[in-house]
Amino acid sequence: MKKRILAFTLVLAMTLFCFAGCGKKQEAVKDTPDKTMTDVTLNEVAHSIFYAPMYVAIEEGYFAEEGINLTLVTGFGADKTMTAVLTNEADIGFMGSEASIYTYLGGTEDYVVNFAQLTQRAGNFLVAREPIDNFSWDMLKNCTVLGGRAGGMPEMVFEYILRKNGIDPMADLDIDQSIDFGSTAAAFSGGQGDFTVEFEPHATALEQKGDGYVVASLGEDSGYVPYTAFSAKKSYIEAHPDVVQAFTNALQKGMDYVQSHTPEEIADVIQSQFEETDKETITTIVTRYYDQTSWKDNLIFEEDAFTLLQNILEESGELSQRVPYADLVNTEYAQNAAK
């Protein structure tokens, strides 16, 4: 735990200038009446189809309808997204909620508070070198798996699934954590590992190239977990409650859209967010997430979900003590948006 807190401290000291030039102004698709607009910078942990409801809200003009002029920045990691929020490079962060726990336990006075939960399942997949019709998790024993960063949600959920299936992550297999996030698919194509844990679009890309085959969904096998949420510094929420409410309202409209439209329709809306990916591939990926109920129908971060998150952190050896739900989660804005 001390190492995890130290990691965030070092990031604060070393990465203050990582975010310049990375922002993209998100233009409203719909015409909106003249109104006073508020600039909001949102730093997302990654740019992924997994977060489709947020991109629907952008592309359908829901943020503009709520009076928000949104700039979206990709942080490429929860540590960097958290740093952007804590150093006022971003107003709102979108990342795994474990980051809020780490900073809280690290003694940050103006800590971040989660106010809206977007995803309720893990968004990554286990990829094998050959198709496996009747996959079982014990097939990973004595194998090498390309995994994720220690202390991050992808890796902790993977280890959580292993333990649920009677597998010791430390003793029964070799989890290679030496490869940077985003580079594991290329390493797997190059011959490293027997399996790899991949987000989209990398999982589908491996299949399309014939280099790998999805054999399991971590989202399905883990059950419901509070995977990603929106958060802001306590002081920002206190100073700008109307902005936080408007932001959450826009997100809820995006959630409503994905609940009432087909994967094909969702793919049509978000395609401009992923210009390097063809429409058919986007539809395939959206369908995967859609079929496993990745997205909640509301944004309320329930207490039992937060308890499960702390259970996962504790089992992974990343939590030295429990933190209060009431301190790190505010459901007021999500509840209002869901009405």
What is each PLM-predicted segment?
Residues 97, 156, 230-231, 264-268, ...:
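A generic alpha-helix surface/boundary motif
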Residues 1-39, 336-339:
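Short, low-complexity disordered leader/linker segments with a strong preference
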Residues 48, 75-79, 94, 152-153, ...:
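Soluble non-cytosolic domains of exported or imported proteins
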Residues 58-59, 64, 163, 207, ...:
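Short polybasic/polar patches that bind polyanions
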Residues 238-320:
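Secondary-structure end/capping motifs
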